[in-house]
């Protein structure tokens, strides 16, 4: 995968050079480039200006973004604009983006964008119903969530399939050694070696956590008969 990020603050992306994204680069699975679009700004390197018609704040001008984009070595990329008004990012969206060969991120700043910038864009993405100072933190989040889903990045494909949301449910609790720590014990079933019971316990815990914390995720979930039965048992506990 090739990723190009248009930003006023390339240094903010230094953390991406570590951990999973850094390993993907080292393996040659990922190429990631940062482009400061101020370098392509006309008018004394000004990247923003006042909005026509008046209003608060400054808008990013179209010219620096377009000229920077024109210099990218891309063929048919998904072009992502980070915008609070965009489609909300989630695990399914990350899985969709992980199938792409080229991604371009446009990170805004100031009050907003000249609307004409959006003619370059295929996706407008938001992390949620809140506003950040710029698009850089959102871009880093999306890159990290997406890159870890690329085959061979994590080493084992199953490494992410049990993540919360990958299955459509929240992840079950997990434990490691010691079996007892400060009076807190690992559930006996996990120490039993009985794989059928362990699988059912994990299923029950995952369904329970989802029901208690994110019941909205269950609305479109494709239940097995066993899962449906377990969920009904969980619901009946509160009656």
Swiss-Prot record:
Keyword vocabulary terms for this entry: Cytoplasm, Methyltransferase, S-adenosyl-L-methionine, Transferase, tRNA processing
Molecular-function annotations in GO: tRNA (guanine(37)-N1)-methyltransferase activity
The keyword Metal-binding belongs to this UniProt entry's keyword annotation: no
Annotated residues for binding of S-adenosyl-L-methionine: 108, 127-132
Keyword Signal (UniProt): no
Signal peptide residues on this chain, from the entry's feature table: none
Enzymatic reactions: guanosine(37) in tRNA + S-adenosyl-L-methionine = N(1)-methylguanosine(37) in tRNA + S-adenosyl-L-homocysteine + H(+)
Gene Ontology CC terms, in alphabetical order: cytosol
SUPFAM superfamilies with a match to the protein in the record: alpha/beta knot (SSF75217)
Enzyme type, top EC level: transferase
Any one GO biological process: tRNA N1-guanine methylation
Subcellular localization(s) per the UniProt record: Cytoplasm
InterPro entries according to UniProt: Alpha/beta_knot_MTases (IPR029028), tRNA_m1G_MeTrfase_C_sf (IPR023148), tRNA_m1G_MeTrfase_TrmD (IPR002649), tRNA_m1G_MTases_N (IPR029026), tRNA_MeTrfase_TRMD/TRM10 (IPR016009)
EC number: 2.1.1.228
Family membership: Belongs to the RNA methyltransferase TrmD family.
Protein task: Specifically methylates guanosine-37 in various tRNAs.
UniProt subunit comment: Homodimer.
Name under which the protein is recorded: tRNA (guanine-N(1)-)-methyltransferase
Origin species: Streptococcus thermophilus (strain ATCC BAA-250 / LMG 18311)
Gene label: trmD
